[in-house]
């Protein structure tokens, strides 16, 4: 039930988050068009310093707890660091929420720039190729998350095998007399972090290029929309589920009342919470935060190849509060360095 409850918490957490930044997008657009959306995205990014401070709090408290345990300090020291670590998990989830909201706003601003550069009127989902690419885009964050979590599993198993090898071959480790080979474990995690991200990176960069070249500008716009919507949902879900599982495990240090009975560390309920935390760590630390990068990078790659896909005989620039209303510009005088345009009546 711990796994089920954690999944439910993450899924429910998407509701309020999506409602809030959907309202932010809509109000910014109604007030100032896509310029307002761009300013909103800039304002969200202006909180970067605060986000970094919030995100740094959790790892500092977690490391303090690890140092306290390895130093065999008094139990109350570990209890205090666990409380701080629980707060750190919550603040980290808040910081990640800011990051994914800014990614969504940035993606919308980049989406508007993409439509302008390609010269298309909009994204018509009644077209079969556009709808197909919308579904493909929605699938990409799911596959990306799977690859990221699979990488964590592979690296973890390699680490476990290395630790077992050291226990077998280096005498006195368990008694505290032998010196473990720490560098080997660090080497395994570092190599896995670099090597296992090659495939997700290729998936992120190459897929929008292939969609654009083989299907065109409008289906690529549908693909971008699918990645953005699906990526935001998965990011919120995974960040909050992972944080809930981690905090559930830490709460057993002080004791948790379940069905009128106090459960402590080492109980069956605590073992279930440890299992949940094993699932939650790759959720909140690996695949969840990576959705932010996936969304932004997809939109940026699409924007880079937009001039190749677009038809620039007529350049359209959205100037009103409604995206459907565009003003056409035609070249009136052309020189080597300067283009002079005149407005054409609709």
Features from the language model and the residues they span:
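Hydrophobic packing and interface segments
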Residues: 1-324
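Short linear regulatory motifs and low-complexity interaction segments
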Residues: 317-346
């Amino acid at each position: 039930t711990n796994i089920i409850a954690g999944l439910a918490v993450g899924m429910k957490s998407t509701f309020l988050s999506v409602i809030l930044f959907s309202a932010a997008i809509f109000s910014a657009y109604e007030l100032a068009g896509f310029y307002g959306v761009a300013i909103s995205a800039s304002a969200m990014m202006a909180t970067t310093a605060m986000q970094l401070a919030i995100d740094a709090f959790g790892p500092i408290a977690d490391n303090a707890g690890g140092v306290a345990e390895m130093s065999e300090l008094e139990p109350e020291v570990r209890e205090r660091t666990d409380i701080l670590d629980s707060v750190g998990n919550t603040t980290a989830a808040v910081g990640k929420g800011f990051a994914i909201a800014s990614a969504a706003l940035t993606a919308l601003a980049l989406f508007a720039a993409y439509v302008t550069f390609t010269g298309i009127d909009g994204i018509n989902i009644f077209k079969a190729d556009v709808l197909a690419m919308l579904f493909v885009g929605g699938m990409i964050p799911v596959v990306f998350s799977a690859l990221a979590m699979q990488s964590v599993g592979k690296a973890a198993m390699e680490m476990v095998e290395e630790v077992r090898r050291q226990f077998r071959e280096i005498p006195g480790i368990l008694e505290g007399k032998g010196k473990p080979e720490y560098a080997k474990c660090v080497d395994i995690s570092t190599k896995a972090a670099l090597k296992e991200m090659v495939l997700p990176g290729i998936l992120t960069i190459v897929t929008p290029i292939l969609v654009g070249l083989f299907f065109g500008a409008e289906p690529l716009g549908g693909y971008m929309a699918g990645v953005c919507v699906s990526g935001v949902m998965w990011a919120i879900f995974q960040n909050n589920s992972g944080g809930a599982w981690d905090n559930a495990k830490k709460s057993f240090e002080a004791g948790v009342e379940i069905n009128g009975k106090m459960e402590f560390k080492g109980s069956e309920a605590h073992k279930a919470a440890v299992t949940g935390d094993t699932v939650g760590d790759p959720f909140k630390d690996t695949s969840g935060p990576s959705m932010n990068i996936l969304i932004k990078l997809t939109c940026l790659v699409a924007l880079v190849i937009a001039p190749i896909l677009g038809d620039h005989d007529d350049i359209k620039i959205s100037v009103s509060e409604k995206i459907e209303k565009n003003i056409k510009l035609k070249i009136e005088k052309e020189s080597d360095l300067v283009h002079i345009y005149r407005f054409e009546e609709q």
